[in-house]
Amino acid sequence: GIKGAQATAAAMFLARTGSSKADIRTYVEREFGYDLSRSCDEIRPDYHHVESCQETVPQAITAFLESSDFEDALRTAVSLGGDSDTLAAITGSIAEAFYGVPEDLKAECRRRLTPELEALLLAWEARAA
């Protein structure tokens, strides 16, 4: 739990402050002891639904490290299988910090919100700004 949250937060911070993917990988491996040496192609064949940070966070970070943009990061995370919504949430948080979210994707997501949820999102964005 806590170790996974700390590793994710550290990766997000490093991504947001301009660190390279290589630097993010090195930091996470060194500080949290996660093995990020397996590629997504190596993870995919035997990955299954796991609720443990030790078997979710490293895979999510690897999906980010192998990605070329925000959408690719999410698609790569989901393609691993297993607990794909959790993987995509972790990967997406790091990818957003590194790449940003394309405006067309933001617009499409907003279009799908109910008016109540859109108002809540706008209020949160105003408060976070």
Map each language-model feature to its residues.
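Solvent-exposed loop and edge beta-strand segments that line ligand/cofactor-binding
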Residues: G1, P45-V50, D83
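Short, structured coil/loop segments at alpha-helix boundaries
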Residues: G1-I2, E29-S37, Q54, P102, ...
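Catalytic phosphate/nucleotide-handling subdomain of diverse soluble enzymes
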Residues: G4-F13, A60-A129
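Small-residue-rich helix-loop
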Residues: A5, A9-M12, S20-Y47
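Double-stranded RNA-binding/processing signature
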Residues: T17
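Conserved phosphate-donor
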Residues: S52-T62
